[in-house]
Amino acid sequence: SASLVGSEMCIRDRNITSEGYFTYLKEFKGGHNINATAGYSYFERNGEGFNMTNYNFSVDGIKYWDMNQGSYLRDGKAAMSSSKDISEKLFSVFGRVNYSYNDKYMASASIRHEGSSKFAADNRWANFWSVTAGWRISNEEFMKEIDWIQDLKVRFGYGVTGNNDFDASYMANLLGSDTNWMLPNGVWAYSYGKTQNVNANLGWEQKKEWDLGVDYSFFDGRLYGKFDYYRRKIDNLLYSVKVPQPPYTIGSQYQNIGSMESKGWEFEVGGDI
């Protein structure tokens, strides 16, 4: 019966991750310590799928196990389709240096050069970096007489990070079925058009953040926690916005539009009784 329908679908996703780095550790006389790291990271994602549907099976139970038994495949009327995702690649090289002196003064700096295939060639690469500094006041000589303070540290940090969180297909010139109509001879005709407005000027969303904080531990570790005050600003926000038709084919497009700022404070308090 033509009502006996069998379908089979196969989807395959492949993720490739590769990372490599080396670390240099050195302790110098006088309490100086250096920890340096340099390396790379690579990520790639690919996906593809296949779908098949056949009809007119003689036995209901056989349709999922032997798609050849449906007569529509032999008659050339079975439905088959395949799909392939847009490849997504992310590559970066990075370096980081940490320095400390007698566990009292700390500083660190990092930089990351990162490229994403989601963006056009002119906007693909960007640099992201951060610097931090800290002072463990509790290890100073003038704090030794205050026996109820076990740890008191002040720290400051500033950094720039990037975001490319959108589907890779948004930067591909994809075509899709737009309209279809029947010709006088009874044959269906199809037209194809763009399914999205590619934006060659799209670039990384960037977040700039600075933080001032305090870590503490009092009364032999029975009271501990931290306090942070932060300010954040996000530039070149990635957002899908409405665009006019014409000149655009579709009514929306991903753009870098606007900025967002926030500030606030956070704290944690813990205790052991």
Residue ranges and their predicted role:
Residues 1, 7-8, 12-273:
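Extracellular/periplasmic, surface-exposed regions of secreted and cell-surface proteins
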